[in-house]
From Swiss-Prot:
One GO cellular component term: microtubule
GO biological process: cytoplasmic microtubule organization; meiotic spindle organization; microtubule nucleation; mitotic cell cycle; mitotic cytokinesis, division site positioning; mitotic sister chromatid segregation; mitotic spindle midzone assembly; mitotic spindle organization
Keywords linked to the UniProt accession: Cytoplasm, Cytoskeleton, GTP-binding, Microtubule, Nucleotide-binding
Family recorded in the similarity comment: Belongs to the tubulin family.
Function: Tubulin is the major constituent of microtubules. The gamma chain is found at microtubule organizing centers (MTOC) such as the spindle poles or the centrosome, suggesting that it is involved in the minus-end nucleation of microtubule assembly.
Organism, scientific name: Schizosaccharomyces pombe (strain 972 / ATCC 24843) (Fission yeast)
Name under which the protein is recorded: Tubulin gamma chain
A Pfam family that the UniProt record links to this protein: Tubulin_C
Subunit structure: Interacts with mto1. Interacts with mto2.
InterPro entries in UniProt: Gamma_tubulin (IPR002454), Tub_FtsZ_C (IPR008280), Tubulin (IPR000217), Tubulin/FtsZ-like_C (IPR037103), Tubulin/FtsZ_2-layer-sand-dom (IPR018316), Tubulin/FtsZ_GTPase_sf (IPR036525), Tubulin_C (IPR023123), Tubulin_CS (IPR017975)
Binding annotation for GTP: 142-148
Record's subcellular location: Cytoplasm, Cytoskeleton, Microtubule organizing center, Spindle pole body
GO molecular function: GTP binding; microtubule nucleator activity
SMART domains per UniProt: Tubulin (SM00864), Tubulin_C (SM00865)
Length: 446
């Protein structure tokens, strides 16, 4: 029986990666662009109902809600090949459509004004589920809508559905290059507070690493956002394969999260994927032979990680879950795990087991790939704190000069004082300390 997941897409980035995610799922499940099941899709071993429901005319419709404060991106999606896939009642674009002006406070205030409409959609989707497991939020934390409206959604979902899991796929800005959004550190910090306090699990995707991986695989200096989003949709579909092609383990969100997050604060996950194939990213470099060991070893290489972190000497894994798709023999997996342990490819926390968990999953029978095995690693690693430190440093530099604060003071949340900034900074500083404490052998007795 499917445990359903409702996907919430907020802002430009959230809707763009969401659009490619749904295209990927349709291809994997043999669903046509208008939601009808293709005539060849007769295998019947998959659970489509986790992410789709069937309408009265038997079309498959995504359990998705598309929200944006300016219409361009959503209108592009609706006029595209897959435009008729979505339920039109689940699309919310604000009437005047001016966007949030890359301002967290603007996005947050906007969300308060349209809160009833958003909640009506969410409640309707939740009521239409037999056994709702949780929500998946797709957004970026640098702009206005994804960070501000996304933050508001996280808080309200937590209040309204306290027992449901909230997972996010959060795109972090490229902090290594000059941004076109000068207030990005403010937006990121304010959103990070909500990701820390109101989400159960955050899959961190970072534009710098995505651009680097796309450039490396495609031999191109400047990969487009479309190509980077394809990497994201590949990661998202791979991270949900065990839900859609269930096996004995990891066939619901709660079991995946339980194996990865031993202490609730440290719930920010990084991902690696290998190999990217021609179908997923055109003209990608082909890897000639894929064995289970080869895939598991490659997943541990920093260059395949979708987050650019600065590990210190003490940085270590808290936990790892490898999802291996394709023809994998459990005996090979066991041998590979022994080899990885012998060769010390990965260093783990000193106070817990050195556990790499492996979930074997089927591949979609409808997509032909030129390799036997592919793998996704979801990992909890203490070096993720370096990403938060970067955000904090950039925030401190802006805040010291009180730069660009006037835009924020126009909104109700900052009208009287700037306490919200200070409390967000405290939460993120505590989060960094928590990850650093994990590197201490005495963590459990601290």
């Amino acid at each position: 029986m499917g445990r359903e997941i409702i996907t919430l897409q907020a802002g430009q980035c959230g809707n763009q990666i969401g659009s490619q995610f749904w295209q990927q799922l349709c291809l994997e499940h043999g669903i046509g662009p208008d939601g009808t099941l293709e005539s060849f899709a007769t295998e019947g071993v998959d659970r489509k109902d986790v992410f789709f429901y069937q309408s009265d005319d038997t079309r498959y419709i995504p359990r998705a809600i598309l929200i944006d404060l300016e219409p361009r991106v959503v209108n592009n999606i609706l006029s595209d090949t897959y435009g008729s896939l979505y339920n039109p009642e689940n699309i919310l674009i604000t009437k005047n459509g001016g966007g949030a002006g890359n301002n967290w406070a603007n996005g947050y205030s906007h969300a308060e004004r349209i809160f009833e409409d958003i909640m009506d959609m969410i409640d309707r989707e939740a009521d239409g589920s037999d056994s709702l497991e949780g929500f998946s939020l797709l957004h970026s934390i640098a702009g206005g809508t994804g960070s501000g409206l996304g933050s508001f959604l996280l808080e309200r979902l937590n209040d309204r559905y306290p027992k449901k899991i909230i997972q996010t796929y959060s795109v972090f800005p490229n902090s290594q290059s000059v941004s076109d959004v000068v207030v990005q550190p403010y937006n990121s910090l304010l959103a990070l507070k909500r990701l820390t306090l109101n989400a159960d699990s955050v899959v961190v995707l970072d534009n710098a690493a995505l651009a680097h991986i796309a450039a490396d695989r495609l031999h191109t200096q400047n990969p487009t956002f479309h190509q980077q989003n394809q990497l994201v949709s590949t990661v998202m579909s791979a991270s949900t394969t065990t839900l859609r092609y269930p096996g004995y383990m990891n066939n619901d969100l709660v079991s995946i999260i339980a194996s990865l997050i031993p202490s609730p604060r440290c719930h920010f996950l990084l991902t690696s994927y290998t190999p990217f194939t021609n179908q997923q990213v055109e003209e990608a470099k082909a890897i000639r032979k894929t064995t289970v060991l080869d895939v598991m070893r490659r997943l541990l290489l920093p260059k395949n990680q979708m987050v650019s972190v600065n590990p210190s000497k003490k940085s270590c894994f808290i936990s790892i879950l490898d999802i291996i798709q394709g023809e994998a023999d459990p005996a090979d997996v066991h041998k590979s795990l022994l080899r990885i342990r012998e060769r010390r490819y990965a260093s783990f926390i000193p106070w817990g087991p050195a556990s790499i968990q492996v979930a074997l999953s089927k591949k979609s029978p409808y997509i032909k790939t030129n390799h036997r095995v592919s793998g996704l690693m979801l990992a909890n690693h203490t070096s993720i704190a370096s990403l938060f430190k970067r955000t904090l440093d950039q925030y401190d530099r802006l805040r010291k000069r009180n730069a660009f604060l006037e835009q924020y003071k126009k909104e109700a949340i900052f009208e009287d004082d700037l306490n919200e900034f200070d409390s967000s900074r405290d939460v993120v500083a505590d989060l960094i300390n928590e990850y650093e404490a994990c590197e201490d052998p005495n963590y459990l007795s601290l």
